[in-house]
Amino acid sequence: MVEIGKYNTLKIVKDLDFGVYLDGGDDLEILLPARYVPRNVKPGDEVEVFIYHDNEGRIIATTAKPLAIVGEFQWMECKSVNDMGAFLEWGLMKDLLVPFREQKMPMREGKWYLVYVHLDHVTKRIVASARVDKFLDNVPPVYEFNQEVDLLVADETEIGYKVIINNLHWGLIYHNEIYRRLERGEHLKGYIKEVREDEKIDVSLTRLGYEKVEGIAGIILDALKVQNGFLPVHDKSPAEEIYSLFGCSKKSFKQA
C-alpha cells in the first residue's frame, strides 16, 4: 500500500511512450510521467517517487522533490487565492491548497507562511494548514540532554528564535547563543539544552557538556562550530566588528 504525500520506493511494471507505470499494491498501477522517469530504467527496476493526486484527482508519481511532505512544516509562498482557498508553491506542478478554515488570517498572493502539510481527514488529499500550533506539542517532550535534533527556524522573537523540533515540538534558541542571523525556513541541526518543568524546550546550536571551553575562547569556538569553521573576522579586523560579534575587545579576541 502506497503512502500518499510521502516518498515510496516502487517497482516499474510497464514502460510506455508517455511514462512508466509503478506497482502501487492492491492491483493499483500509478503513472510516473515520462518527464520524471530516470534514464536507463526498465520494468522490474525500483524508483523512489513522491505520491500525490494530480489536478484530476488521480494518484500520480513524481521524482520531483516537494518543499515538505506530509507530517512536515515549512515556509511557503502563496501563489494564488480563489474561492477554494489559497495555493502555495511547494515545488510540484500542482500547487498546495490551504483551505480557508486552515488560514490564521486571509492569505495574500506573494506572502510567505509557515504551514503544516497533512492529509485532509475527509478527502484524503494533501493540504496545508497555517494553524500550526494544533500540530505541535501533542506528545510529551521526551528528550535527553545534548540529544541531536532537527530544527526548522519558524520566527524571531525579542529573546531569540522559535524553532520546530523534529516536526513535533516548539523550541527556543536564545539570541546570546547565536553568532549569525538565522533565516525563516532554514533547516539545521541542534542540541537539546533543557526541557523545563512547563515542558518548554531550550535548544542550542552547539553540543553542550563538561568539555565546553569557557570565556571568550569558548564563545569563539561555538561561533566557529555554527559557521562550519569560518568566521569573517581576524586579528586585523576593526575593533568595532569584533565587539559586535563577540562582545569583547580586540585585545581579548587576540588573547583568546
Model-predicted regions and their roles:
Residues 1-256:
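Single-stranded RNA-binding regions, centering on S1/OB-family and related RNA-binding modules
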